[in-house]
Each structure stands twice: as structure tokens, then as C-alpha cells.
């Protein structure tokens, strides 16, 4: 089977050296076979299962966002994505027990985002996503991390 490669550049910046940032070195090392994580990550491309609710022209692989969220936030943290698109960041945030607010101007992509959100509300689909990410060593096995209380999956924020 032939491999195809794509590259995503991620800029990790902050406004000032006075502002602290969070990086979970221990978890990243654990996910990387007990070796310090490098700044070049090789992750699976977008799978068909990630496009079950439609295609977005610049959709990112769920694994990329899951790794970024784990590396840079703690469980329960808020994640803001001002360019929501197909809500991959929101899906990753939700799967990893973070709160999420996404902004999107295009109705087509809002509908896709809502469908993806509804999809992971199904516990079978949610568990499948978590198992796929764990198998790819992007996250720890699902029983090893915090999962948000599903009684209010919207965190009190209305879903439009």
C-alpha cells in the first residue's frame, strides 16, 4: 500500500514571555514510548470515519487536534476555535474532557459540526473514536483520563 504524506504547520506562540504556558511533558513522553516528544509528529491522516458527516476543504486529522489539546491544556479547560469549520477541535476537546466554544460563519459547516457533535453523543461512536485514538497512541486508553460529565454535554452553552 502506498503512503501519502501531508504536512500541517503549527505555530505555538504567546503574546509575552510574562504569560505562562502549559505543556504536559509527562503525558507527551508517556505517549511517545517514554521518550521526550519531538517537535515533528507523525500521525495518521484523516480517516474515512472522520468524514462520516461530510467533508470540509481544510479539515484537520482528529489526532493532530487531540495531541495539541492534551499537550497544551488540562482537563476541564476551555478551548476556543474562532474558525470552527467541521468542528474537529470541538470533537477532540469533548472526547478529552475539555469545554469548547467554536465560531463559524458558514451555515453548511455549522450543520456539519452539529451532525458530528450529535454523532459522538452516541456512546458506541464515542468509544470507537477513543479506541482509534488510543490504538494510534495519540491518547492513553480511555479508562486512564477524565471524561466530562455527560449530563450537560453543552456546558450550559446553547448549541445553535
Predicted regions and their residues:
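PRPP-dependent phosphoribosyltransferase catalytic core
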Residues: 108-160
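Core catalytic lobe of class I
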Residues: 1-112, 157-159
Amino acid at each position: 500500500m502506498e503512503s501519502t504524506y501531508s504536512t500541517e504547520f503549527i505555530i505555538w506562540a504567546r503574546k509575552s514571555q510574562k504569560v505562562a504556558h502549559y505543556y504536559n511533558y509527562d503525558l507527551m513522553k508517556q505517549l511517545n514510548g517514554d521518550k521526550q516528544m519531538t517537535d515533528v509528529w507523525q500521525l495518521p491522516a484523516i480517516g474515512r470515519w472522520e468524514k462520516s458527516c461530510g467533508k470540509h476543504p481544510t479539515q484537520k486529522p482528529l489526532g493532530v487536534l487531540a495531541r495539541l489539546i492534551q499537550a497544551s491544556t488540562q482537563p476541564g479547560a476551555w478551548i476556543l476555535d474562532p474558525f470552527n469549520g467541521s468542528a474537529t477541535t470541538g470533537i477532540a476537546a469533548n472526547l478529552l474532557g475539555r469545554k469548547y466554544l467554536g465560531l463559524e460563519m458558514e451555515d453548511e459547516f455549522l450543520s456539519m459540526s452539529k451532525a458530528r457533535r450529535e454523532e459522538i453523543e452516541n456512546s458506541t461512536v464515542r468509544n470507537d473514536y477513543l479506541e482509534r485514538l488510543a490504538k494510534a497512541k495519540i491518547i492513553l486508553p480511555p479508562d486512564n483520563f477524565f471524561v466530562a460529565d455527560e449530563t450537560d454535554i453543552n456546558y450550559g452553552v446553547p448549541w445553535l
